[in-house]
UniProtKB/Swiss-Prot annotation:
Signal peptide limits: none
The entry's keywords: Cytoplasm, Ribosome biogenesis
Family that this chain belongs to: Belongs to the RbfA family.
Domain of life per record: Bacteria
InterPro entries referenced in this protein's UniProt entry, alphabetically: KH_dom-like_a/b, RbfA, RbfA_dom_sf, Ribosome-bd_factorA_CS
GO molecular function: ribosomal small subunit binding
Name of the molecule in the record: Ribosome-binding factor A
Cellular compartments per GO CC: cytosol
Function comment: One of several proteins that assist in the late maturation steps of the functional core of the 30S ribosomal subunit. Associates with free 30S ribosomal subunits (but not with 30S subunits that are part of 70S ribosomes or polysomes). Required for efficient processing of 16S rRNA. May interact with the 5'-terminal helix region of 16S rRNA.
Location, primary (coarse class): cytoplasm
GO BP, sorted A to Z: maturation of SSU-rRNA
Subunit structure: Monomer. Binds 30S ribosomal subunits, but not 50S ribosomal subunits or 70S ribosomes.
Organism of origin: Aliivibrio fischeri (strain ATCC 700601 / ES114)
Compartments in which it is found: Cytoplasm
Amino acid sequence: MSKEFSRTQRVSQQLQKELAVMLQREVRDSRIGMVTISDVEVSRDLAYAKVFVTFFCVGEQTPESSLAALKEHEPSLRMMLGKRIRLRLTPEIRFTYDNTLVEGMRMSNLVTDVVNTDKRKMAESGRTESDEGEE
């Protein structure tokens, strides 16, 4: 009988939960700001964990500066993880900025702009959307 999830998937889910709690409650660094863990990818041998993060930056903060500050905490977070999760080897954490949210919003704005431009051009030419379908 096969398992519903592989061990790496279960470990990555657990790491995501634990890291989210630790970043929210235990890491006190104003340079990081609000951070969200969007995904965790664990290597097959469970030695490395690639943690994808997004930031809500305020004021002078940039995703790059927040990521640099977060990377300074990698060793201490790994040590805390080792105490919380029972694994033979605690994965080495590598934080990576996840720009999919920003890119998704950019793409959505582009589509909205194109739709609005099409509507404006149709209105200027005196045609309606129902006329477009009859051709």
